Amino acid sequence: MKTSVVILAMSYITSIFANNSYDFCDGEFAISEKDDKCGFSFNPCTLYKQIQKEYSNCVILRFYLKAISNMLESICDNNKRCLPFSIDSLYRPLYNREQFKHKHHHTLYALFRNCLYLVNPIYFKEYQDALACNQLDVCYFLIRRTVCPKYGVTKYIECLKKRCEDRFDEKELAIFICDSETFVNIKLEIDACRKICPADCTLDICKIYSLDFWERRDLLKAIFDYHYCHVLSSDNTRDEIIKKIEEIYLNGTERDIKFTSFIIYQLFTDLVACKSSDKNIKRILDLICLYEKKDKCPSGVMVMIEFFVKVCSYQC
């Protein structure tokens, strides 16, 4: 019975990857017939939209992903020679979105990873155990695109801060906690995704500038939520600031974007990792004054300036 359930779940997922139609019938899966000899044609956007329609029914989502996890665990524990491909292919790293379509896309590992792309990080520990791999190369955006995307960045920043204060060994920080039930090695993944936070506890302005919209949003939320919750009067205030920053990055000039990136950089380096000082505060305020003289600040930049001054005043 268990085997038939697994096969049913796998068939269902296969149908999604082959862009087949599907229906839900009292908790069972109805698969339409279609020749998929060409393999899976995985489209992250299409898959996400299809799953999103039924995402409110988390029981179904967990059911077939858990079935895959059980099957992988069984594969690792039992006869590996029954596999139609090498067990080593289960551990092939995928470092970015483009590699979801690499030449090994037909393997069970790729199918497993493509589904993991949509899963809440709370399940990572189960999958990591099922694969029996302590260095599972899970892409950082697998964490970033989940229901609670800020956990990975928040905890990573927290660990960097502790390391700066307590001089923890690098190996001791190999595994970071994303939430109460998740253990994922995200340092390598964050480093691989344009190095949001390098190990020296600083943020690089150019790297912030190069982040995509969602990476920047998550980084800001992590910094605000973890380090500046005592300054912000409410979540609405934080959300308003983030909204203004988003407007700058979407509609502002290149100068506006670089300037805002610089403020974000200062928020982290001077006031968190390096601790604020009068010299640092004066330096950033002088640059703000220089910026105001040369160009009229857009409203979003002014909001950031006001927030920064408020934080500086609090720190002093």
From Swiss-Prot:
Residues 1-18 form the signal peptide. It comes from the Eukaryota. Its main location: other. Transmembrane segments: none annotated. Glycans are attached at N19, N251. It is found in: Spore, Perispore. Coiled coil: none annotated. One of its GO terms (biological process) is sporulation resulting in formation of a cellular spore. The keyword Glycoprotein applies. Keywords: Glycoprotein, Signal, Sporulation. This is Spore wall protein 30. It comes from Nosema bombycis (strain CQ1 / CVCC 102059) (Microsporidian parasite). The gene is SWP32.
